[in-house]
Amino acid sequence: MAANPSGQGFQNKNRVAILAELDKEKRKLLMQNQSSTNHPGASIALTRSPLNKDFRDHAEQQHIAAQQKAALQHAHAHSSGYFITQDSAFGNLILPVLPRLEAE
């Protein structure tokens, strides 16, 4: 099966066009950012984003808390072990509590 060289040329041209458009948008945004620092009134739209971010963070925390509660209830109902909710570096919602046994 022979590759279609004209199709590859079209893909390359398409990629170049997309990259050029992205570069143009990047420059446009950089220019807007520079002009907004020169004009304090222009940065009003930028100050609203932390409020939305805080709202999303709060909603995400509530969702995680609900997931932790459900996972904890399930673990206690189906296991004889003891579990706690704690942030995990690996994304675990609950962690098992293991007793320390002293060496004899």
Swiss-Prot record:
Key word Hydrolase present: no
Which InterPro entries did the record assign? Answer: SOSSC (IPR031821)
Where does this protein have coiled-coil stretches?
Answer: none
Localization, per the record, is:
Nucleus
* Keywords assigned: DNA damage, DNA repair, Nucleus
Q: According to the UniProt record, which cysteines are disulfide-bonded?
A: none
The main place the protein resides is nucleus
Gene Ontology CC: one annotated term: nucleus
Which BP terms in the Gene Ontology apply to this protein? DNA damage response; DNA repair; double-strand break repair via homologous recombination; mitotic G2/M transition checkpoint; response to ionizing radiation
Question: Quaternary arrangement and interactors, per the entry?
Answer: Belongs to the multiprotein complex Integrator. Component of the SOSS complex, composed of SOSS-B (SOSS-B1/NABP2 or SOSS-B2/NABP1), SOSS-A/INTS3 and SOSS-C/INIP.
What family name appears in the similarity comment?
A: Belongs to the SOSS-C family.
What this chain does, per the record? Component of the SOSS complex, a multiprotein complex that functions downstream of the MRN complex to promote DNA repair and G2/M checkpoint. The SOSS complex associates with single-stranded DNA at DNA lesions and influences diverse endpoints in the cellular DNA damage response including cell-cycle checkpoint activation, recombinational repair and maintenance of genomic stability. Required for efficient homologous recombination-dependent repair of double-strand breaks (DSBs).
UniProt name for this protein? SOSS complex subunit C
Q: Which organism is it from?
A: Taeniopygia guttata (Zebra finch)
